[in-house]
Amino acid sequence: MVRPGALAFNRRTAQIATMCELLGMNCNVPTDIRFSFSGLIQRGGRTGPHRDGWGIAFYEGRGCRTFHDPLPGCESKIAELVRTHTVKSLNVICHIRKATNGRVCLENTHPFTRELWGRSWAFAHNGRLKGVKDWPLRFYRPIGTTDSEHAFCWILDQIRRRHPTPPKKDMAVLRLVRKLAAKLNACGTSNMMLCDSRYLYCHCSTELSWLTRRAPFGEAHLIDTELTVDFAKETTPRDIVTVIATRPLTHHEPWQVMERGRVVVFRNGLQVGA
């Protein structure tokens, strides 16, 4: 259990240290992201300094719907649209930006998306990667100027080089992603989320926490805004929902701090390939 006092202290200190913040969700049934999104978006200029844009990618079947805005999340009409309309998905990646590499503009907002093997892949990153923009690319090119997007293109390049077609065993991709994440981590800070519509890959370089909600469900209270949800009224007993965030979003829930240097993968709301 995370102590509320510790969360308040971490929130103040992280405003200085954290360059961006990430939010991911992976579930076994389509689940509404609005509660967690409502907490994260407050950190986009109101309770946090991440005013340089925001974005969300969520899957609907094999398709991936994205919204981006270079405006602060707490002021964005598009963010308000997402926050007030039902958004249910098995996999979601959100990002609020504190620009450190690349100017503030639409093309530099995360998550980034590309196609591989006929699937939409989404990626968001927190940190700085020294020298990564010098790494050669073959199949993919950045649209913007961030080191994050270059790293994403490089990851997919490496996966495509090793596996031109989908490997028979999904764990082959997991093993490769772990190696690629370690190489990126050697260049600086690489907290990242990567999704192929089925698996959500999360790498912790400095700071990520995660929480799995399942029956019996209870109430949850956001840290950054006055909002409470009783999940017992919003779910069924079979629902399994895992939320991953740079910093915990709620009080009095058993958030787990992810081990630094580790890639944790989720499918259907559960950790796989541990």
Question: Could you say what each language-model-derived stretch is?
Answer:
Residues 12-77, 220, 261-263, 269-274:
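Extreme N-terminus nucleophile/cap motif
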Residues 20, 121-131:
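Conserved beta-strand-loop-short alpha-helix elements that form
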Residues 61-65, 119-120, 131-140, 198:
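Cytosolic regulatory regions built on CNB/CRP/Popeye-like sensor folds
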Residues 70-82, 96-118, 135-138:
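Short acidic (Asp/Glu) patches
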Residues 132, 138-162:
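Glycine-rich phosphate-binding loop plus the immediately following alpha-helix
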Residues 144-147, 205-229:
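Gly/Ser/Thr-rich active-site loops/lids in small-molecule metabolic enzymes
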Residues 166-206:
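Catalytic core of PPM/PP2C metal-dependent serine/threonine phosphatase domains
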Residues 219-262:
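A conserved acidic, glycine/proline-rich C-terminal tail/linker
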